[in-house]
């Protein structure tokens, strides 16, 4: 009653929610947590429904007992692998053998590698006196013996009838005198177990020899010699040489079975047909191939291995930090890592390099604000073509190798105590020694400053007339200062250019030269790390590259409110509103 109630509840649940009945069953190749584990296809009769090639079949020409053209009296090879029952046993039958010896061969192609557990034959005639079973692992190209049956093992097959099986010979075919009796005259059985009596069968996972031994793509059965009816009063003389009075014989088999599993090396739970209708494993664990016998591309961090009960031995992806699509396996690196990792990335992208694409290639450095897996993890060094001694920078800091006297991350300016030269070999040269008497070092203003100039007022107004009188109008940031002879040399960064008659004046680092007397009289007044509006006249000087400013120049601390006004004046100048003074 309880079982009936449970069944009824399940039916109601499926009717209410069809999804309950359609849920995908769990994948046997992974446990409940998603971790890989060994999986194997179901055990099947691999011979069922397969075509069997027989070297001899009765019915052509027709005889009293066999006619290939009459389905009721035909005994084709298809009967060997069809559905047989005890009540309806269909039998294949060979031609009548009038002359002996006469071998009859049955060849079965499994269509794929199988791990064979047994081969069995159920006879409709008396069992043969001598039978040999062979297997092929290369789809019938070559054959190796699997098992012999004979009452005369040494005479027929050159094998002893009772050989001892050891680990040294467990992959060799044996010969037995069992299962060769004449009786029963029908329904007799020959059953060969591939692992029976093999010493390593208990540890099959660790025995490559036995794994190879049970593998087959084709099975061949050779009936070498039938029973001669001496015991039933048959002739002895002339029987084996096919004398005129020899008794006729034939072989007849009702069922050929090959029990085993699709060979998938523990990496698939089933076999399916591919686009060409060939049987292949439905591989998991990042494996591929008809038998899951190799790793998928990019999963070469460790060598392919067969799965075992203890280890799934799944193929692992190479660690390339998302910068490569291909890799290869290196056994030496794998051994050095303690058999943990042997993958080597190929063709690293995004300016990366290394076995794992884990550092930047030459000419680039790491942007530590981004993950190593980011496409922009490596930035170009951008070393100055003149100031840098090479194109390669420090891969951690990005610092380029600077020439003597050059400084900056990209080697784009002269260091303190050096001045720019015209030589690309030595772009910065040391400033020559200065005569102390010619340098104004006092911070006090000279006595004649009042008559010399007047400092600029803070509320200075900019108009079109003053704008037009100047050769350049720029916004600058004062970086540092050094003295050269009677001049103060300021390293500046030009932030904006509002007017310029000299094409060399561009945004970026430059120099501003002011005579020391002008600076001492605070005409103009300048402080380091401040922003200024500079309006002045261009003066070409080979000794002093950059901008020049004097007591007549306008150098006042920058105000953001001027931006709009200066852009307006700039537009008016382009329209021709400036009249040349």
UniProtKB/Swiss-Prot annotation:
One example of a Gene Ontology biological process annotation: dendrite development
Boundaries of each Laminin N-terminal domain copy?
35-261
Q: Which residues are glycosylated?
A: 88, 103, 394, 540
Q: Where is the Laminin EGF-like domain?
A: 262-317, 318-380, 381-430
| Iron-sulfur listed as a keyword | no
Q: Name one Pfam family in it.
A: Laminin_N
Compartments where located: Secreted, Extracellular space, Extracellular matrix
Classification via SUPFAM superfamilies: EGF/Laminin (SSF57196), TIMP-like (SSF50242)
Signal peptide location: 1-15
Cysteine pairs forming cystine bridges in this chain are 91-124, 262-271, 264-281, 283-292, 295-315, 318-327, 320-345, 348-357, 360-378, 381-393, 383-400, 402-411, 414-428, 449-521, 468-578
Q: Which UniProt keywords apply?
A: Disulfide bond, Extracellular matrix, Glycoprotein, Laminin EGF-like domain, Repeat, Secreted, Signal
Origin superkingdom: Eukaryota
Q: Where are the transmembrane segments?
A: none
Name the GO cellular-component terms: basement membrane; extracellular region
InterPro entries per the record? Answer: Laminin/Netrin_ECM, Laminin_N, LE_dom, LMN_ATRN_NET-like_EGF, Netrin_domain, Netrin_module_non-TIMP, TIMP-like_OB-fold
Per its UniProt record, what PANTHER family does this chain match? NETRIN-3, NETRIN/LAMININ-RELATED
Its function? Netrins control guidance of CNS commissural axons and peripheral motor axons.
Q: What is this protein called?
A: Netrin-3
């Amino acid at each position: 009653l309880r079982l009936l109630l449970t069944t009824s509840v399940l039916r109601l649940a499926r009717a209410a929610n069809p999804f309950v009945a359609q849920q995908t069953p769990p994948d046997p190749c992974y446990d409940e947590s998603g971790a890989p584990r060994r999986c194997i296809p179901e055990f099947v009769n691999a011979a069922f429904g397969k075509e069997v090639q027989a070297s001899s079949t009765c019915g052509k020409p027709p005889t009293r007992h066999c006619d290939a053209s009459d389905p009721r009296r035909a005994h084709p090879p298809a009967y060997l692998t069809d559905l047989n029952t005890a009540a309806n046993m269909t039998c294949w039958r060979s031609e009548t053998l009038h002359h002996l010896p006469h071998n009859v061969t049955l060849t079965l192609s499994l269509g794929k590698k199988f791990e064979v557990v047994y081969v069995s034959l159920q006879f409709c005639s008396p069992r043969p006196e001598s039978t040999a079973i062979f297997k092929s692992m290369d789809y019938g190209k070559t054959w190796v013996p699997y098992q012999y049956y004979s009452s005369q093992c040494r005479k027929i097959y050159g094998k002893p009838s009772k050989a001892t099986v050891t680990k040294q010979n467990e992959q060799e075919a044996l010969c037995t005198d069992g299962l060769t009796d004449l009786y029963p005259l029908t329904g007799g059985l020959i059953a060969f177990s591939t692992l029976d009596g093999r010493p390593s069968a208990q540890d099959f996972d660790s025995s490559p020899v036995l794994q190879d031994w049970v593998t087959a793509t084709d099975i061949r059965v050779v009936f070498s010699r039938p029973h001669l009816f001496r015991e039933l009063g048959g002739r002895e003389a002339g029987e084996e040489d096919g004398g005129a009075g020899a008794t006729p014989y034939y072989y007849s088999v009702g069922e050929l079975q090959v029990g085993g599993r699709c060979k998938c090396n523990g990496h698939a739970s089933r076999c399916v047909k591919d686009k060409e209708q060939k049987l292949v494993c439905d591989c998991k664990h990042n494996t591929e191939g008809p038998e899951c016998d190799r790793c998928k591309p990019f999963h070469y961090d460790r060598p392919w291995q067969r799965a075992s009960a203890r280890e799934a031995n799944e193929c692992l992806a190479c660690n390339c930090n998302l910068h490569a699509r291909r890799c290869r396996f290196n056994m030496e690196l794998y051994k050095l890592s303690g058999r943990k990792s042997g993958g080597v990335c190929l063709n690293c992208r995004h300016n990366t390099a290394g076995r794992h694409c884990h550092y930047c290639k030459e000419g680039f450095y790491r942007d530590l604000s981004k993950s190593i897996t980011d496409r922009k993890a490596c930035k170009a060094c951008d070393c100055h073509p003149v100031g840098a001694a090479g194109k390669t920078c420090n891969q951690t800091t990005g610092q380029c190798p600077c020439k003597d006297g050059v400084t900056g991350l990209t080697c784009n300016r002269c260091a303190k105590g050096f001045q720019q030269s015209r030589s690309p070999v030595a772009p910065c040269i040391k400033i020559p020694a200065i005569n102390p008497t010619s340098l104004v070092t006092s911070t006090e203003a000279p006595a004649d400053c009042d008559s010399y100039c007047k400092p600029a007022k803070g509320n200075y107004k900019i108009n079109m007339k003053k704008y037009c009188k100047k050769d350049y109008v720029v916004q600058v940031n004062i970086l540092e200062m050094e003295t050269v002879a009677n001049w103060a040399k300021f390293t500046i960064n030009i932030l904006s250019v509002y007017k310029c008659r000299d094409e060399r004046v561009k945004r970026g680092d430059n120099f501003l030269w002011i005579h020391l007397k002008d600076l001492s009289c605070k005409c103009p007044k300048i402080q380091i790390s401040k922003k200024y509006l500079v309006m002045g006249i261009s003066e070409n000087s080979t000794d002093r590259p950059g901008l020049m400013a004097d007591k007549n120049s306008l150098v006042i601390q920058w105000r953001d409110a001027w931006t709009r006004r200066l852009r307006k004046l700039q537009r008016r100048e382009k329209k021709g509103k400036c009249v040349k003074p």
